[in-house]
Amino acid sequence: MTQISERLLVQAHLDAKQSNPLTPEQEADYRAAIAAELKRQNAVLVAHYYCDPVIQALAEETGGCVSDSLEMARFGKNHSAETVVVAGVRFMGETAKILTPEKRVLMPTLEATCSLDLGCPVEAFSAFCDQHPERTVVVYANTSAAVKARADWVVTSSCALEIVESLMDNGETIIWGPDQHLGRYIQKQTGADMLLWDGACIVHEEFKSRQLADMKALYPDAAILVHPESPEAVIDLADAVGSTSQLIKAAQTLPNKTFIVATDRGIFYKMQQLCPDKEFVEAPTAGNGAACRSCAHCPWMAMNTLERVLDCLRQGSNEIFVEPALIPKAIKPLNRMLDFTQAARLKVSGNA
């Protein structure tokens, strides 16, 4: 997934899959129907911050969860619902199934994937790991169940830095996959000995440092918020770097009234909800037209529509299955992450 021509083919495929816009009346009907189905089926809707605002609002209204991938995993595992509907991309649905194999996990579409997942096929990644058996394998959550099963640790962007620091303190050297930009950022912050896989997010790698500097000149009082999946030159311009949840917290706590945000624009829903008196501006990508492969919104996240949420509930379609042999292997590094972050939470709160 590194050639522009390949990106354009992917984008054309995804554009063809998008539904027509709904009228306000149609949207209200879908939301009511989905809420009724969730209640009838003892189901819960979990949505990522990058989903369209209407999906995030629906998850909140129906007692579900809107969060980053770490909290999505934790919420789905701990919730009493028999069915979890995951509005996000496929690896998120797989993670939910791995953590709670006894539950039914549905997704609005199984075609919503991730360029990081696609760019890290298990055969090639396993061969890379086999060449360095002395290294601890740490993989980003944006990977397939098979890649997770090959790993020692799974991390999200909200906990990756702390986990790598802990491993480094233990004298461990690391294989990191698949996001090269996040890996390089962690390497720079910690000084850890890391071999990096060559993957990238099609949204975040589109942010451009020169255009970002030009935009900062237009908004001199703005703070720049950057997700660490962005290129290093973009990260270097940031006032705050972090995961989606960390960027939302930065928007709440920094005194600035204007923010230039270098991550998927789906996050603006929660930022504007929590900070109604502040202004949020999209960081510039490659530009308009064919050269812009994402334009600050993941095309796969955009495939999570109201129509597809209702269809998957009514038809029981798009159920996530994970190969049974992979589950015990993949759940170990996932539980390590959850246990680590829970212990860190307790330590911060003074309970450990």
UniProtKB/Swiss-Prot annotation:
[4Fe-4S] cluster binds at C114, C201, C298. Pathway: Cofactor biosynthesis; NAD(+) biosynthesis; quinolinate from iminoaspartate: step 1/1. SUPFAM superfamilies: NadA-like. Keywords: 4Fe-4S, Cytoplasm, Iron, Iron-sulfur, Metal-binding, Pyridine nucleotide biosynthesis, Transferase. Its EC number is 2.5.1.72. It is found in: Cytoplasm. GO terms for biological process: 'de novo' NAD biosynthetic process from L-aspartate. PANTHER family: QUINOLINATE SYNTHASE, CHLOROPLASTIC (PTHR30573:SF0), QUINOLINATE SYNTHETASE A (PTHR30573). Belongs to the quinolinate synthase family. Type 1 subfamily. This is Quinolinate synthase. It comes from Pseudomonas entomophila (strain L48). The gene is nadA.
